[in-house]
């Protein structure tokens, strides 16, 4: 069967400007959250990615009027109806689990297919389920393909998350906005996307305090009204372009960026020796090789993001000595290692840590096993001698708006082909 591939002829310097998209990890939660509104919602600054289109079509399955126009989405929930959500759409992206919290909050019941997304090893939703149960939901998991959630009523509860989880923190917030009384989420995730979702819910009239700290308090309200809301910039897309610019950038200017959100990456790139200039809403990057070797350990925000350990890895082949990358969040997130080895990289991974040594990369045929592995392979392709062909690019399009066009505009020799 024919499929699209991305091809890159490496070695071209990057120069120019890129406008960073709205945050994927905010958008995929805020779109489901619109169904909690009574009336009309307008979202601005959405990333133009396939995950957004899938979630909009899930809203339409609930008889919600949704008009997606580029970066803008208008939603009218006046005619909303509860309906089972089909497995074929839900399984294509993991963030469809936010429909559970939103539908539970709105209807006190839902039937939804089991979520999909990138295969990153064990990513259970047990913390989400724990939260829903604490709020009064009964959960039927007897089907292999779907899950049924029902609550006679939702009541506020004190929920302590066993592990810090962005998804569970947001999903419990969505379910709790209409619950009677106060819900407290302790050991809550502090990521900017959690704050963004809370700000959106508050723009509709929700009573939420403490988002961005480890303890979030939600006082249930009867009704949420419509609103207009602008989504924050995508710190992971920004970080990925920062890594590409550090690899091959003569001078790359990134606009629509919140420097504080990429601070952990910025500090690590400066340790490597990258020339970085920071302004209010933009960052300028210039390549300054050879780089110094560094060690990286992923942590929850504000630590080094797990989503950026793959995109930064190709830079570590350009250093003077060995580097170590440890992923404490997803220790199985090293499927890119085998693909980099095909390109001649001296890299090995074991039990959540990769050992990376200076290497010359050569173009090869490689496979994007997940979204951020795809960004890693693009960066590797920009550095490599010869042509790199990346297969399974659907993962890349799930998270990066027009990435081929953006890189082409910066001077990369990059194109798509159908094979």
Swiss-Prot record:
Cellular compartments per GO CC: cytoplasm
GO-annotated molecular function: UDP-N-acetylglucosamine 1-carboxyvinyltransferase activity
Catalytic activity line of the entry: phosphoenolpyruvate + UDP-N-acetyl-alpha-D-glucosamine = UDP-N-acetyl-3-O-(1-carboxyvinyl)-alpha-D-glucosamine + phosphate
Cellular compartments annotated: Cytoplasm
Active site, per annotation: 118 (proton donor)
Disulfide bridge positions per record: none
Residues annotated as binding UDP-N-acetyl-alpha-D-glucosamine: 94, 123-127, 307, 329
GO terms classed as biological process: cell division; cell wall organization; peptidoglycan biosynthetic process; regulation of cell shape; UDP-N-acetylgalactosamine biosynthetic process
Annotated phosphoenolpyruvate binding sites: 24-25
Group of enzyme by EC: transferase
InterPro entries (UniProt xref): Enolpyruvate_Tfrase_dom (IPR001986), Enolpyruvate_Tfrase_sf (IPR036968), MurA_subfamily (IPR050068), RNA3'P_cycl/enolpyr_Trfase_a/b (IPR013792), UDP_GlcNAc_COvinyl_MurA (IPR005750)
Keyword Zinc among UniProt keywords: no
Entry keyword set: Cell cycle, Cell division, Cell shape, Cell wall biogenesis/degradation, Cytoplasm, Peptidoglycan synthesis, Pyruvate, Transferase
Pathway(s) annotated for this protein in UniProt: Cell wall biogenesis; peptidoglycan biosynthesis
2-(S-cysteinyl)pyruvic acid O-phosphothioketal modification, residue list: 118
EC number, as in UniProt: 2.5.1.7
Function according to Swiss-Prot or TrEMBL: Cell wall formation. Adds enolpyruvyl to UDP-N-acetylglucosamine.
NCBIfam families per record: murA (TIGR01072), PRK09369.1 (NF006873), PRK12830.1 (NF009470)
Family, similarity comment: Belongs to the EPSP synthase family. MurA subfamily.
Name assigned to this protein: UDP-N-acetylglucosamine 1-carboxyvinyltransferase 2
Taxonomic source organism: Staphylococcus epidermidis (strain ATCC 35984 / DSM 28319 / BCRC 17069 / CCUG 31568 / BM 3577 / RP62A)
Gene name of the record: murA2
